[in-house]
């Protein structure tokens, strides 16, 4: 059994992590923690998330002393703000823990990106260089050796799973940048109350146009430029991405289908549609990314869906942990 703790367990993603880890046969969920300043400190986890009453009734302990918190702990999950993960991940790593960070603090190796897109100067570039990007279907061998796994963002996960097989097999004319229009449920904005996620204010609208921090993450790990526009939808959870691409001359739908099937034939959490395209309702509450596509001439439209809190966050973190420690990849997820 591996002893584990979750920091940031009061939020939506942290709650999903706690539920997965509680039912994982090889994990011993020792502690759920929040920042020392959190208004949720010392509350019972299941009082905040009543669906887990009688299942996970641990207290939310304030994180005041990382050295003590890390004692006897093998695995740490950080469901914390970017700046917080930036500061505390190296301390848990120094204590010998394996860290799965769900923030953006270690996803992009170019340190200059953090000042521009995240608003802080990165001070741990040595860990930027060592962090393994946890796109599970494409980084399994590297994840197996990692001490720090940077779990991808929600939009980058679905975008890359849709585009990587096409780019790796040189099927796209990348002089025409892929155009990614993706809509997320309001849970992507977090649990903290704000005008943005107020019931009466939620509509369907784009945000972060040309400035969203997931743009450089997608581009760095795809190795190509893209046009990415995120949207906020008036539903609780899930992401649907519609991606428009230009094909190289002569590329057929049959080739595209074969490329996808070869890429994901042994990847149980990616489901491919042979007919039609996926709908959001088929992935909400599940750890899958569903992918379908339509071709007309040299134009390709790929549609990908995922639950932003699961395959876009908590489920992928647990998937990476399973890979890292040699467990069944879908352990506790299905």
Swiss-Prot record:
SUPFAM superfamilies: Glyceraldehyde-3-phosphate dehydrogenase-like, C-terminal domain (SSF55347), NAD(P)-binding Rossmann-fold domains (SSF51735). InterPro entries: AGPR_AS, AGPR_type-1, NAD(P)-bd_dom_sf, NAGSA_dehydrogenase, Semialdehyde_DH_NAD-bd. HAMAP family: ArgC_type1. GO terms for biological process: L-arginine biosynthetic process. This is N-acetyl-gamma-glutamyl-phosphate reductase. It comes from the Bacteria. Belongs to the NAGSA dehydrogenase family. Type 1 subfamily. The gene is argC. Pfam families: Semialdhyde_dh (PF01118), Semialdhyde_dhC_1 (PF22698). Catalyzes the NADPH-dependent reduction of N-acetyl-5-glutamyl phosphate to yield N-acetyl-L-glutamate 5-semialdehyde. Transmembrane segments: none annotated. CDD domains: AGPR_1_C, AGPR_1_N. The keyword Oxidoreductase applies. The keyword Zinc does not apply. It catalyses: N-acetyl-L-glutamate 5-semialdehyde + phosphate + NADP(+) = N-acetyl-L-glutamyl 5-phosphate + NADPH + H(+). GO terms for molecular function: N-acetyl-gamma-glutamyl-phosphate reductase activity; NAD binding; NADP+ binding. Pathway: Amino-acid biosynthesis; L-arginine biosynthesis; N(2)-acetyl-L-ornithine from L-glutamate: step 3/4. The active site is at residue 154. Its EC number is 1.2.1.38. It is found in: Cytoplasm.
């Amino acid at each position: 059994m591996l002893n584990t703790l979750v920091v940031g367990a009061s939020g939506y993603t942290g709650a999903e992590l706690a539920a997965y880890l509680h039912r994982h046969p090889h994990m011993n969920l020792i502690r759920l923690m929040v920042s020392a300043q959190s208004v949720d400190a010392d509350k019972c986890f299941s009082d905040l998330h009543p669906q887990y009453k009688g299942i996970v009734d641990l207290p939310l302990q304030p994180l005041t002393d990382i050295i003590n918190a890390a004692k006897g702990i093998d695995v740490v999950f950080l469901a914390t703000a970017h700046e917080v993960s930036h500061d505390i991940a190296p301390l848990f790593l120094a204590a010998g823990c394996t860290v799965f960070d769900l923030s953006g603090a270690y996803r992009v190796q170019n340190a200059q990106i953090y000042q521009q897109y995240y608003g802080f100067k990165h001070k741990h570039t040595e860990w930027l260089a060592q962090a393994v990007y946890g796109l599970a279907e494409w980084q399994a061998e590297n994840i197996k050796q990692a001490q720090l796994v940077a779990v991808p963002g929600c939009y980058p996960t679905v975008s890359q799973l849709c585009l990587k097989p096409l780019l790796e097999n040189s099927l796209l004319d990348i002089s025409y940048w892929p155009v990614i229009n993706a809509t997320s449920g309001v849970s992507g904005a977090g649990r903290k109350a704000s005008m943005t996620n107020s019931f009466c204010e939620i509509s369907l609208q784009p945000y972060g146009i040309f400035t969203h921090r997931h743009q450089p993450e997608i581009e760095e790990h795809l190795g190509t430029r893209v046009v990415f526009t995120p949207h906020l939808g008036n539903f609780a959870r899930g992401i649907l991405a519609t991606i428009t691409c230009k094909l190289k001359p002569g590329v057929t739908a049959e080739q595209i289908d074969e490329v996808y099937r070869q890429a994901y034939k042994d990847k149980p959490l990616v489901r491919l549609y042979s007919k039609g395209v996926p709908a959001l309702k088929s992935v909400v509450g599940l750890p899958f990314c569903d992918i379908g596509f339509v071709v007309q001439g040299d134009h390709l439209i790929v549609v990908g869906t995922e639950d932003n809190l699961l395959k876009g966050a908590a489920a992928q973190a647990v998937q990476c942990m399973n890979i890292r420690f040699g467990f069944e990849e879908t352990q506790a997820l299905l």
